[in-house]
């Protein structure tokens, strides 16, 4: 999620840009002309649907739509979506590339593609390795805050641009959940082969957290533990009924329609300087096509379902009390679905936002991540695990 999500989304097309945000206004019905003759009996309204329920349904649906817009959810009908321009460095923002992951280019496994990455490495042999997956519309630079901290404690961090984002192939086109999951597994295998005796952690934020959950549910012999930071687990099963129709129709009826940020009052982080830097980053993907909505929703639904299948060696699931993107009931549903006996650590941070690694209060979640990576059996140093029980009791 990027900095321009601080503003309101309006719907614009490539050929007909809108100057004002779309708004929902009640339809005015023309006055009826009274008929002559006997009046027909008027059927009473069903008692099971009081009229006050209708405005409540509209408010809930509108709230869901605003959260969807904040995510700028993206998938489906990639062939119909226009390609995003290739990112280029600017005077204020340079593009740092430390290497490339060479992976199979599905569906043509004999061909390979390169996913550029940044790395933050300790001076000597690392005690642990982290493969860090960014969120939607973000890039490898999402980890520029956490990466140096982990490297200073002997942990190597590799942060790639995932396919469809940053400077990776297919920028601006949704590659599909299966492709993103396959890419993550291939990159993990590459890092594991470099040194099989160093524990490898798959870490993801938002969309990247959803991928981490999906991989963890199926298991991967190369990966020792998982960290999901504000994972996108808002599955369609938790949407109100009208939103099902929106999701189903968006990719078919308006695949080229784009979402641009204007005046959406959602706080992604309390660190405005960091949000502005993300918005100015040339690797950030802006105005994703609305046709990509359906696929990302499917990914979130898959991650939500896979919460019930988590059987990984160790998993840390983190969520902020001021997360305006993933609703609390979706996170609570995921946490409650985790099987008993699973080695999952739940952590709730009442003071943090969706992009908690950028927050002014980021020291607490970063300290918990560091402890989780360094100490297998030690509890988190903060009160986040206790606060998680309070969160579940309230939701």
Describe the role of every protein-language-model region:
Residues 58, 72-109, 115-122, 393-395:
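An N-terminal hydrophobic leader/cap segment in hydrolases
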Residues 127-135:
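Short beta-strand element of the alpha/beta-hydrolase
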Residues 136-140, 165-195:
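Catalytic nucleophile-loop/oxyanion-hole region of alpha/beta-hydrolase
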Residues 147-169:
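Conserved alpha/beta-hydrolase
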Residues 205-289:
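Alpha/beta-hydrolase-fold enzymes
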Residues 317-319, 323:
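Short beta-strand/loop motif that positions the catalytic acidic residue
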Residues 327-337:
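Short alpha-helix in the alpha/beta-hydrolase fold that links the catalytic acid
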Residues 351-395:
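Catalytic active-site module of serine/aspartate enzymes centered on a nucleophile-bearing elbow/loop
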């Amino acid at each position: 999620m990027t900095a321009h999500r601080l503003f309101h989304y309006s719907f614009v097309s490539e050929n007909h840009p809108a100057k004002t945000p779309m708004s929902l206004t009640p339809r005015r019905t023309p006055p009826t002309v009274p008929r002559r003759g006997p009046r027909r009996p008027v059927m009473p309204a069903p008692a099971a649907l009081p009229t006050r329920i209708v405005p409540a349904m509209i408010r809930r649906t509108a709230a869901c739509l605003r959260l969807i817009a904040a995510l700028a959810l993206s998938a489906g009908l990639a062939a119909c979506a226009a390609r995003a321009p290739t990112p280029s460095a600017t005077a204020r923002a340079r593009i740092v590339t430390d290497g490339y992951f060479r992976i199979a280019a599905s569906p043509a496994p004999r061909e390979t593609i390169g996913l550029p990455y940044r790395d933050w490495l300790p001076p000597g042999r690392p005690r642990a390795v982290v493969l860090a997956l960014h969120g939607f519309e973000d890039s490898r630079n999402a980890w520029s805050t956490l990466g140096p901290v982990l490297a200073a404690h002997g942990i190597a961090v590799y942060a790639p641009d995932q396919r469809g984002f940053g400077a990776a192939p297919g920028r601006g086109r949704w590659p599909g959940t299966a492709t993103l999951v396959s890419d993550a597994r291939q990159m993990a295998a590459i890092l594991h082969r470099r040194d099989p005796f160093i524990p490898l952690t798959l870490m993801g934020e938002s969309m990247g957290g959803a991928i981490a959950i999906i991989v963890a549910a199926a298991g991967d012999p190369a990966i020792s533990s998982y960290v999901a930071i504000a994972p996108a687990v808002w599955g369609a099963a938790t949407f109100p009924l009208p939103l099902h129709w929106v999701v189903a129709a968006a990719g078919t009826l308006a695949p080229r329609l784009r979402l641009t940020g204007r005046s959406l009052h959602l706080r992604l982080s309390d660190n405005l300087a960091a949000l502005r830097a993300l918005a100015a980053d040339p690797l950030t993907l802006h105005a994703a096509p609305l046709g990509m909505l359906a696929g990302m929703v499917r990914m979130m639904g898959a991650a939500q379902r896979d919460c019930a299948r988590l059987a990984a060696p160790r998993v840390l699931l983190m969520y902020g009390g001021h997360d305006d993107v993933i609703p609390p009931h979706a996170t609570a549903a995921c946490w409650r679905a985790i099987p008993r006996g699973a080695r999952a650590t739940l952590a709730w941070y009442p003071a943090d936002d969706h992009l908690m690694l950028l927050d002014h209060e980021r020291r607490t979640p970063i300290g918990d991540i560091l402890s989780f990576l360094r100490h297998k059996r030690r509890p988190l140093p903060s009160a986040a695990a206790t606060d998680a029980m309070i969160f579940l009791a309230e939701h």
